[in-house]
Structures are given as C-alpha cells and as structure tokens.
C-alpha cells in the first residue's frame, strides 16, 4: 500500500491518558470495533509514512465520543505523549459493508453541495465533525464555511457516484 487512497483515517491521537501509556483517540469512524478489538493498526504523522502498531485494548469513555487505547510497546506517559497528533489508520480494504442508504462519512468529503438535484453547486463538503449528530463542513462558493447537520431532513439525497448531495436547509442555516 503506497498512496493515501489505500488508507482510511479512523481517528486522531489527541492526548495521553494516565501514566501507563494509554492514549485518547478522537474517532472519525462510526465503527467502534476499530478502537476496541485488538489487532494491527497503523499510525501516520502529518507528512510521514504509515507504520504498523498493535492495538492491545480499547474502550470508549463513558458519556463521551473519545476512546482510550493501549498499543504494544507504549508503556509510559512519555511514550504516549510522543504519539499525540498522529492519525490512526486502517487499510481502505477494511471498510465494513453498508446497507442501502448508509454512507461512509469520509466518502462525503469533496462532494458538491446543491439545493436542487439539477441545480448548480453552492459549495463543497470539506470536512466532517462527529458529535451528537454528524456535521458536514461545507465551504460555500462565496468562501464562507457552514456546518450542516447530516440528517435526512436536511440532506435528503446523496449521489456518491455523481459527486453531489442535495441540501434542504431550514431558513437561515446557510447564513450562520
């Protein structure tokens, strides 16, 4: 695996947890097993190459979206802090299959945002935030960025193969 297209970023290491080498991960994946099931994962620094690391244990923090993980060979706080800021990766071939109407959120990044199926683009999806509801960050053609809840009432149509999604925002949402 050589290119970025061969990898999925499933989370970011955001902080050391305790003194035994555990780390907190901010997930960008809706599949908790990526953080809880032992096995091989990969870490990547901003401009570095992915390198393998063994996930030993993982758990979700109660009431939070963060996970706490333990990697092989990371046995103290200093070793954990050295990894903060890196991305956690899995091979793109590890994508779980989805039911009709479900999407891998990362596939939405780059899509045109439209108000009508046959209409012009009003912007592009540039990022996503996982919170209580997933939020799409859309950069409007005017240059402003807005956060749009990824719920069916506001994003009723997604055409991955055609490269766009349709928005039906409530009044004022795109003006915030």
Curated annotation (Swiss-Prot):
Q: Which GO terms describe its biological process?
A: ribosomal small subunit biogenesis; rRNA processing
Q: Which GO terms describe its cellular component?
A: cytoplasm; ribosome
Task: Print the keywords alphabetically.
Answer: Chaperone, Cytoplasm, Ribosome biogenesis, rRNA processing
Instruction: Cite the PRC barrel domain residue spans from the record.
Output: 100-173
Give yes or no: UniProt keyword Cytoplasm: yes
Q: Which Pfam families is this protein grouped with?
A: PRC_RimM, RimM
List the SUPFAM superfamilies.
PRC-barrel domain (SSF50346), Translation proteins (SSF50447)
- What's in the domain note? The PRC barrel domain binds ribosomal protein uS19.
Its job? An accessory protein needed during the final step in the assembly of 30S ribosomal subunit, possibly for assembly of the head region. Essential for efficient processing of 16S rRNA. May be needed both before and after RbfA during the maturation of 16S rRNA. It has affinity for free ribosomal 30S subunits but not for 70S ribosomes.
> Family assignment?
Belongs to the RimM family.
* Name the UniProt record assigns to this protein: Ribosome maturation factor RimM
